[in-house]
Amino acid sequence: MADSQNTQSSSSASGSYQVPAYERKPGVAGKISSVGSDTLANLMTFWSQEFKTLYPQVGFQIQASGSSTAPPALIEGTATIGPMSRELKPSEIRDFTRTHGYPPTVLKVAMDAIAIFVDRRNPLPGMTLEQVDAVFSETQFCGSNTAITNWSQLGVDDIGYRSPIRLYGRNSVSGTYGLFKVMALCDGDFKNTVNEQPGSASVVLSVASGTGAIGYAAYGYKTAGVRALPLGESLDSLIPLSIDTVRNETYPFARFLYLVINKKPGEPLPTLEREFLRYILSQEGQQQVLRDGYFPIREDVLVRQRRLLE
């Protein structure tokens, strides 16, 4: 653990920021229950394991069935924290507010991107956003007039890629599913040939297991068997998925990852919950984000999130 006086400095157009190292506090014990995103499952595990090395008397229960399971658990009081890979829907905010009398507090804790994965041998250099819609969508609301069902329509005619494209994606309780539907399909409908998987790891494994497959999933689950395609408005302006293009949000499907909590306005959080969130929004917590293959939030954003805990 870094010394508590160490800080990580950064500057932006709006000023200079200090991201503090985490400082251990006395008397932290209890149990945290987390219900929500599969995308954040590994990261929640990393955070909880490292936090337990600081506070052995703390226990965690982590359930990762999808972002849509987080709001009901917070409303019913069966979860302390609700990890989500998408923003809350207006209806979810209304339901929470109706129950508790105030809205939920939403913290940005990491950055991710929804990647379009192909197997590592696939020669496709990249895709336009219109092509992505034409591959995955039944309705093609993003502008394409022709559905894409074969690799030859994307300029790939190598042996092994002459059969119809096999499609993989997430199931409907996933925040990744809902966000991809909005961002990539212009809120259209998925083709019924998309093989829905319970987790991003399953999507990546399916794409890597044989030629001719393509799938969308959280970039943090990338393996050596797949490649994330550059994307853009045109084939002449493809943007690779990298830490820079995600953090500056130029990659088309960049997104924040969130933790939703129940914080009554004007009252402090319980000590255990506050300290766990302070750890996440510290140098050490953001190092775990990198460890899991995601991207730390910009320092100016992080400082704003820490203020929400006050």
Please name every model-derived segment:
Residues 2-310:
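Flexible loop/hinge segments at secondary-structure junctions
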